[in-house]
């Protein structure tokens, strides 16, 4: 069996070898997610599945671990291919912030971190305010793992290629894989962002944590000549902000996925997101695992090649790239 464990960045080596892409979820019946054709500046996309298609496939499974339309949409948002429905309204609000005498700092909650909104929008990380309660909340979700019994139950429901699930025994569940993406974003932002402690330690109660985050930002605003603005896609969090008089912006999800083009970088990110959140996908003749036995780092993926010629070419290019990287040549 031809396999390679790679980093997310090394996905580009695989993408460079295929002009046309077809990505499917192998545990659903004939479930092609999208096709893409490479152009000079990126990829021409064609989304192939809608909400009804996902719901029909999910109906054959008793577990909430199977991919949903919302999961697919959030992978596209996190890759920067689609945006929140009211993103234009947020840009207008940004113009209003520029006229304030106070400096504005943007504070993302957990879901906005998962969507990588601040990175995708090019927000200066020095204008970001991180509450460590958010980090604690994310980290508490990182290590929920499948038991052998849970995998056995999933395999009973899966009628197609259920042997792929063997890789998931004692590996991260979906909510933990989602947390991995959020924690990556947090760690990247904190290099330059302002980070503050919560007014109390985080708890296992999400609603209580939301209150801690909002009250922490409100206290920060009172103590400093700065204005924090909480960014969220959670209406309950927005309601708390209203109650506390905290500046905020509530992002809304689009009703449906509308995407026909993406950059090369966004495609690389999308493949990584899908492999992580769906657990396993197939790109042309390559099975890509986001979670697998022996995984050591969040950004690792395992590629399983079903085409010997593609494997030989990929393996050769991977070795060359790694040799150049070891010499400090990028």
Q: In which residue ranges do the predicted regions lie?
A:
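Feature 3881 marks metal-assisted phosphotransfer/nuclease machinery
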Residues: 1-108, 112-228, 235-330
């Amino acid at each position: 069996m031809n396999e390679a464990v790679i980093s997310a960045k090394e996905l580009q080596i695989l993408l460079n070898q295929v002009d046309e892409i077809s990505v499917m979820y192998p545990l659903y019946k004939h479930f092609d997610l999208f096709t893409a054709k490479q152009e000079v500046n990126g990829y021409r996309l064609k989304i192939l599945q809608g909400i009804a298609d996902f719901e029909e496939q999910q109906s054959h499974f008793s577990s909430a671990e199977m991919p949903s339309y919302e999961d697919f949409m959030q992978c596209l948002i996190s890759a920067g291919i689609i945006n929140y429905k009211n993103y234009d309204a947020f840009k207008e609000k940004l113009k209003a912030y520029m006229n304030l005498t106070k400096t504005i700092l943007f504070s993302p909650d957990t879901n906005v971190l998962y969507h990588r909104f601040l990175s995708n929008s090019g927000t200066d990380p020095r204008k970001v305010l991180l509450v460590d309660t958010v980090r604690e909340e994310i980290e508490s979700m990182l290590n929920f793992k499948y038991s052998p019994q849970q995998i056995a139950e999933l395999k009973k429901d899966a009628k197609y290629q259920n042997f792929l699930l063997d890789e998931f025994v004692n590996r991260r569940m979906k909510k933990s894989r989602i947390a991995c993406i959020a924690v990556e974003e947090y760690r990247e932002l904190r290099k330059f962002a302002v980070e503050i402690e919560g007014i109390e330690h985080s708890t296992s109660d999400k609603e209580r944590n939301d209150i801690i985050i909002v009250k922490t930002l409100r206290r920060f605003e009172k103590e400093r000549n700065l204005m924090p603005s909480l960014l969220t896609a959670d209406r309950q969090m927005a309601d708390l902000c209203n109650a506390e008089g905290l500046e905020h912006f509530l992002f809304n999800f689009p009703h449906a996925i509308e995407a026909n083009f993406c950059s090369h970088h966004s495609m690389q990110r999308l493949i990584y997101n899908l492999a992580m959140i769906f657990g396993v996908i197939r790109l042309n003749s390559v099975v890509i695992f986001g979670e697998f036995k022996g995984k050591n780092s969040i950004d690792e993926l395992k590629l399983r090649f079903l085409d010997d010629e593609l494997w030989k070419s990929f393996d050769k290019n991977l070795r060359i790239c790694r040799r150049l990287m070891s010499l400090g040549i990028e």
